[in-house]
Every structure is written in C-alpha cells, then in structure tokens.
C-alpha cells in the first residue's frame, strides 16, 4: 500500500521516479480502511533529503500510511525555505490534540551541545511528554535517541575522542525481538556522530532491551519490551550519498574530517560510495511499522490515554 502525501511535496516526484507508489488524499479516501497515522518530527537541516529518505523506507510496507511532518517553532531554520515549512509542516499547537500510531524523531546536528542549550529543548520536551498519551510507538534516531533517553531516564550522552563516521558492523543481540525479525546475525549500518550512550548507564537506569550493538559503534538499537520506545543510534535511513555529502561539507568548512570508514572503495573519495545497508534499513523500518505499530496500536487511538495491553512477541 502507498503513503498518502500532499502531491506538491518535493519528495513525491523523487519517490515516483524510483517507482514507489504514493497517492494524495482524494484517492486515499476511497479506500475503506483506517491508514496508520505517522508523525515525523524532522530536526535535520536537510529537510527535503530527510523527508525523502524516511518516506522511501516507510513506503516499503503493505500498509497504507498517512504522514504528517512536525517542526519546532522555537527554532528558525537557516537552510530550509520558510514557504516549504509553512506548506508541508505542522506546529505542535496544530497537532497536540491528535493521536498517532507512530512517531519518528530524527537526529539533529546539535549533539556537542548540552541538551538544555538547544534552542528548542523545552518544546521538544513537550513533544516527549505528549507522546506518552498520544502516540503508540516512538522511533528515535541518532541525536533524537540520545535526547529521548535523557528526557525519560536522565541518561546523558558522552563525548567520543573522534567522530564516528562510516559504515559499521553490528550484531543482533535479541533474535526474538520482532524489530530484528528477518535480520542476519550481523548487519551493516551508517553512523555519524560525536557522542555515545554508555552500556552501564542503560543497564543502571533503564529496563530497555539491547537489540543490536557493535565493537566499534557500541550500542546500536534499544527498545522497551512493548516496543513503544525504540532508539536507534545509527542512520539506517541514510541514502548512498549522505555520508559523502557530510564529509565534503565538513571539508569545505575547514574541519579536516576523517574519511568515512568502510564507505568508499579503497578509501578513494572520488569513487562512488558502496551501498551495503539497504536491506537492513528496509527490514528494520518494515518491522517497526508492522510489529511495533500495526500489530499493537489500538483501533481507536483515543484509547492511548488509557493503559494499553501488549499482545507480546509470539
């Protein structure tokens, strides 16, 4: 089934050119089913690229999805046209009375700052609190994962000696988790970050399950047993060129970045980056939509205000 989107959204033409089926509201209304309602809080400066990456993966499911985009009014974007935000994004005030089956909170290039120093931190905390009673499952990505852990469990991020940038091997630790269903024992994923969350803090302060981890990346994917909270420190949503674009951006800014590891053929930055995480990305996002959202969310989303039964893995 397709994603229902505003046909004027720039990502629509890109997805159609890749033979991904999307449709507008007029066509969707004729399908007599309740679509899964997904909210994406896009904190990345590359708004259109991130929209396209996430929608590409969400479209890889047999379910009809209805997607809203959210932005923080306390932050003024320097890289995205105001007209784009006004046309395709909603504010927290617009959606605070709505209910959603799933929420995705993206990463953001603010990880070296203390959380409280981020200009939209208070507004983001409102979203975290609201999501407990208005969203069934929240998928936190990279800095979004670190922010969610800090808000919910007071687990702080720790500065790394060097930036972690490249494609890294991770091991599946919980084979029985629905989120890891269909994965090989090990998988590759992009990572791009200066900070990490420590295993001892997760063990001491939370009851989260460690679904995947790696020797170089440390913790990779965490989740609560009922999958209402999912945390991914990598960037499975990244497309082929994203790390290349980040490397060249930092090079141009005079930051002397290291070449992303395990990314270019023979570490030659003039070569076409090798795509090796597409299957893992498609599997993970499909599992989240199917098992964490569709199989568990109540038909009447208003019931999220109450205690929700968890049907379990098997």
UniProtKB/Swiss-Prot annotation:
Catalysis performed (reactions): L-homoserine + acetyl-CoA = O-acetyl-L-homoserine + CoA
Active site: 142 (acyl-thioester intermediate), 235 (proton acceptor), 237
Binding site for substrate: 163, 192, 249
Protein origin, superkingdom: Bacteria
Protein's pathway: Amino-acid biosynthesis; L-methionine biosynthesis via de novo pathway; O-acetyl-L-homoserine from L-homoserine: step 1/1
Site (Important for substrate specificity) location in chain: 192
Places the protein is found: Cytoplasm
UniProt GO cellular component terms: cytoplasm
Xref: InterPro entries: Class_I_gatase-like, HST_MetA, MetA_family
GO BP term, pick one: L-methionine biosynthetic process from homoserine via O-succinyl-L-homoserine and cystathionine
Top class in the EC scheme: transferase
Marked site (Important for acyl-CoA specificity) residue numbers: 111
Main location: cytoplasm
Single GO molecular function: homoserine O-succinyltransferase activity
Keyword annotations from UniProtKB, A to Z: Acyltransferase, Amino-acid biosynthesis, Cytoplasm, Methionine biosynthesis, Transferase
Documented EC number(s): 2.3.1.31
HAMAP family membership: MetA_acyltransf
Family membership noted in the UniProt record: Belongs to the MetA family.
Function: Transfers an acetyl group from acetyl-CoA to L-homoserine, forming acetyl-L-homoserine.
Cited NCBIfam families: metA
UniProt-recorded name of the protein: Homoserine O-acetyltransferase
Organism: Streptococcus mutans serotype c (strain ATCC 700610 / UA159)
Phylogenetic placement of the source organism: Bacteria, Bacillati, Bacillota, Bacilli, Lactobacillales
